[in-house]
From Swiss-Prot:
Belongs to the MoaC family. The keyword Lyase applies. The active site is at D128. GO terms for biological process: Mo-molybdopterin cofactor biosynthetic process. It comes from Vibrio atlanticus (strain LGP32). One of its GO terms (molecular function) is cyclic pyranopterin monophosphate synthase activity. Pathway: Cofactor biosynthesis; molybdopterin biosynthesis. CDD domains: MoaC_PE. Homohexamer; trimer of dimers. This is Cyclic pyranopterin monophosphate synthase.
Length: 159
């Protein structure tokens, strides 16, 4: 079994030293779902939500969040991201929104946390913008879908 990388021999949490690692191109994809009523989803899809374009706001929030991951998650490194993409898709047959984020860089540490943060904050932004019309919205199934690069290599969720 793999060991925790952020815990030292004394059991204390520390930021991992990546100074000796080689720079490689690294990319990660994550997703999140936001479950809501058909009426709330229709407000978003039709563009008639009183707060404006929910998807555009959530997309920008996700991008901003990816860039601030190091400031939100205590042991994450500040990274020079070269790409952050957040896509939102209404799945009207299931009354939900699917969010997929992609983060990329050439660096010494991975971007999984940045991709997960982007998807999570985009989902939280949808909740924030819609809570006035529906309070029981559910954010669910936030997960890493795929990552490439680095020592641990390629990981992809089994469908």
């Amino acid at each position: 079994m793999s060991q925790f990388t952020h815990i030292n021999a004394s059991g204390e949490a520390n930021m991992v030293d990546v100074s000796a690692k080689a720079e490689t191109v690294r990319e990660a994809r994550a997703e999140a779902f936001v479950q809501m009523s058909a009426e709330t989803l229709e407000l978003i899809v039709s563009g008639s939500h009183h707060k404006g374009d929910v998807f555009a706001t959530a997309r920008i929030a996700g991008i901003q969040a990816a860039k601030k991951t190091w400031d939100l998650i205590p042991l994450c490194h500040p990274l020079l991201l070269t790409k952050v993409e957040v896509q939102l898709e209404a799945i009207e047959s299931e009354n939900k929104v699917r969010i997929e984020s992609v983060c990329k860089l050439a660096g010494k540490t991975g971007v999984e946390m940045e991709a997960l943060t982007a998807a999570s904050v985009a989902a939280l932004t949808i909740y924030d913008m819609c809570k006035a019309v529906q309070k029981d919205i559910v954010i669910e199934n936030v997960r890493l879908l795929e990552k490439t690069g680095g020592k641990s290599g390629h990981f992809k969720v089994e469908s």
